[in-house]
Curated annotation (Swiss-Prot):
Keyword entries, A-Z: Iron, Lyase, Manganese
Pathway named in the protein's UniProt entry: Carbohydrate metabolism; pentose and glucuronate interconversion
Protein name (record): Mannonate dehydratase
Catalytic reactions on record: D-mannonate = 2-dehydro-3-deoxy-D-gluconate + H2O
EC number: 4.2.1.8
Gene: uxuA
Annotated function: Catalyzes the dehydration of D-mannonate.
Keyword Manganese found: yes
Cofactor needs: Fe(2+); Mn(2+)
GO molecular function term, any single one: mannonate dehydratase activity
Signal sequence annotation: none
Length: 393
């Protein structure tokens, strides 16, 4: 696997020097300062690439080229935004960058309720609490019909949880959900959030799939023409939330994608921490079935709690993800490609990490502190080395 590291650009508290010392050789980056829907100019791409290469690293993966909400709802200037997206892909390929991670999640990117969940060892993790999320939906957002998405017991627990919250806790919960986590391209006020959700009235899973298919049928031929690999990121969490459909959550969704646009350019990001939240997702089976379409991996683990829809981010080798067999399956795919004359490694980044040690005293991007990811990368690297020695050499 190619060892990579997500870097948020010149304002990231983790420097490129830190990245190189962590042992990564590739950088996962995006031009976050360019508004959604606008073309990424060649000169901007080359300028960022030069910064990365000056540090002795390679810009391996773009994460992400965000998809404008108009494309997802097929409203407004969606056709113009699709043309802009095509041009950005051409520009990236012209600059020698050939792997793009993206997602098709409506309104929100990845979602958590607690950004400072204290683990038994004192480190801090990210957490999604189903009951707190219900409290937000029912009492802060006041989404019509939200009760139908929860069990009677969950509604009762959410009512009690909200009643016990201080104003500061309510504000923090709201901010965690709608203000935009690292990598999310948009944050909202509560009024803007309600309006954005309303844009999806009448858009169910079938309709969102229709819009996604339209996007893919326009984008993938361009990607194929310029030699670029598109790697869709799964929904996080991988289930409908806020009354919004989710369409990249299961192995069935992956199968639908490859059948809808059967092109080698139409591929996946295997994010074990996202897919792995669902107990019915067999990660190893996913990798084995769609290995030839996996162009990027995010390796992390989560741990489902008593309510299986509540989870926290575990240590990279702990939790519910069988990291040993996941890495083994990825290496088997790399070996298969090598045997067929395609020796390029699959980029892997240690996804998220606990805030620990000195990072507990620093301002960090939630999930993206340095030391937790350093630990995760070292652990995964060790698993990879042991597997290679045992099975591939």
């Amino acid at each position: 696997m190619e060892q990579t590291w997500r870097w948020y650009g010149p304002n990231d508290p983790v420097s490129l020097s830190d990245v190189r010392q962590a042992g990564a050789t590739g950088v996962v980056n995006a031009l976050h300062h360019i508004p959604n829907g606008q073309v990424w100019p060649v000169e901007e791409i080359l300028a960022r690439k030069a910064i990365i290469e000056a540090a002795g690293l390679t810009w391996s993966v773009v994460e992400s080229v965000p998809i404008h909400e108009d494309i997802k709802t097929q409203t407004g200037d969606y056709l113009k935004y699709i043309e802009n997206y095509k041009q950005t892909l051409r520009n990236l390929a012209q600059c020698g960058i050939h792997t793009v991670c993206y997602n098709f999640m409506p309104v929100l990117d990845w979602t958590r309720t607690d950004l400072e969940y204290v683990m038994p060892d004192g480190s801090k993790a990210l957490r999604f609490d189903q009951i707190e999320f219900a409290a937000f939906e029912l009492h802060i957002l006041k989404r019509p019909g939200a009760e139908a998405d929860y069990t009677a017991e969950e509604v009762e627990q959410a009512n009690a949880r909200f009643a016990a919250m201080t104003d500061a806790e309510k504000a923090r919960l709201t901010r965690n959900i709608i203000a935009g986590l690292p990598g999310a391209e948009e944050g909202y006020t509560i009024e803007q959030f309600r309006a954005r959700l309303a844009d999806y009235d009448g858009i169910d899973k079938a309709k969102l799939r229709e819009h996604f298919a339209f996007f893919l049928k326009n984008i993938i031929p361009v990607a194929e023409q310029v030699g670029l690999r598109m790697a869709v990121h799964p929904d996080d969490p991988p289930r409908p939330i806020l009354g919004l459909p989710r369409i990249v959550s299961t192995i069935e969704d992956m199968q639908w994608m490859v059948e809808t646009v059967d092109s080698i350019a139409n591929g996946f990001t295997m994010c074990t921490g996202s897919y792995g939240v669902r107990g019915d997702n067999d990660l190893v089976a996913m990798i084995k079935r769609f290995g030839n379409r996996i162009y990027f991996t995010h390796l992390r683990s989560t741990c489902r709690e008593e309510n299986p829809k509540t989870f926290h981010e575990a240590a990279h080798l702990g939790g519910d993800v069988d990291m040993y067999n996941v890495v083994k399956a990825i290496l088997e795919e790399e070996y298969r490609r090598k045997q067929e004359g395609h020796p390029l490694l699959i980029p892997m980044r240690p996804d998220h990490g606990h805030q620990m040690l000195d990072d507990l005293k620093k301002k960090t991007n939630p999930g993206y502190s340095a030391i937790g990811r350093l630990k995760g990368l070292a652990e995964v690297r060790g698993v990879e080395l042991a597997l290679k020695r045992a099975f591939f050499e």
